């Protein structure tokens, strides 16, 4: 052990051996398992709450002038929740409707191979891997300059 850790270890040993004072009496043998686990009863949070008596820093404490703003905020949230609920209900009723189905034999393909108006005729050269068959640059591209 180092010299700095020795005082901490001694302090821990002294605190563990300190006698219990009358501030937290433990009934001898009487009580439930929870009483034995938490001998101080419902006052366990007192140490955590000490020093928290100031309410000025709390964001939940509103001054008198802002009470109206607080109520308006609640009303906005309530309206937003109602709108969201109505949208969800509308979507739910639409999703439960059965879709109109066509017989499988009459179904028309989404891509009409008869209509070739969207194709562009380029000519006899074919492009493979970015180069044309004749070795020249593809149409519309400038040759690289060194």
Curated annotation (Swiss-Prot):
UniProt keyword annotations, A-Z: Amidation, Cell projection, Cleavage on pair of basic residues, Cytoplasmic vesicle, Mast cell degranulation, Secreted, Signal
| Annotated GO CC locations | extracellular space; neuron projection; secretory granule lumen
Q: Does the keyword field hold DNA repair?
A: no
**MF (Gene Ontology):** neuropeptide hormone activity
Q: Annotated region Disordered: where? A: 91-146
Q: Provide one Gene Ontology biological process annotation.
A: negative regulation of voltage-gated sodium channel activity
- State where the protein is found: Secreted; Cytoplasmic vesicle, Secretory vesicle lumen; Cell projection, Neuron projection
The superkingdom listed in its UniProt entry is Eukaryota
Residues forming the propeptide are 54-146
Q: Per its database record, what is this protein's job?
A: Stimulates the release of gastrin and other gastrointestinal hormones. Contributes to the perception of prurient stimuli and to the transmission of itch signals in the spinal cord that promote scratching behavior. Contributes primarily to nonhistaminergic itch sensation. In one study, shown to act in the amygdala as part of an inhibitory network which inhibits memory specifically related to learned fear.
Family per record = Belongs to the bombesin/neuromedin-B/ranatensin family.
Q: What is this protein called?
A: Gastrin-releasing peptide
């Amino acid at each position: 052990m180092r010299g700095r850790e020795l005082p901490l270890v001694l302090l821990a040993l002294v605190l563990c051996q300190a006698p219990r004072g009358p501030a937290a009496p433990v009934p001898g043998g009487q009580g439930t398992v929870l009483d034995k686990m938490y001998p101080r009863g419902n006052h366990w949070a007192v140490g955590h709450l000490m020093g928290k008596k100031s309410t000025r820093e709390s964001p939940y404490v509103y001054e008198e002038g802002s009470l109206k703003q607080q109520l308006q905020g609640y009303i906005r949230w309530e309206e937003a929740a109602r709108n969201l609920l109505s949208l969800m209900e509308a979507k739910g009723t639409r999703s439960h409707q059965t879709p109109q189905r066509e017989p499988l034999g009459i179904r028309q393909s989404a891509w009409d191979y008869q209509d070739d108006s969207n194709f562009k005729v380029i000519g006899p050269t074919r492009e493979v891997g970015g180069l044309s068959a004749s070795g020249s640059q593809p149409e519309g591209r400038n040759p690289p300059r060194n």
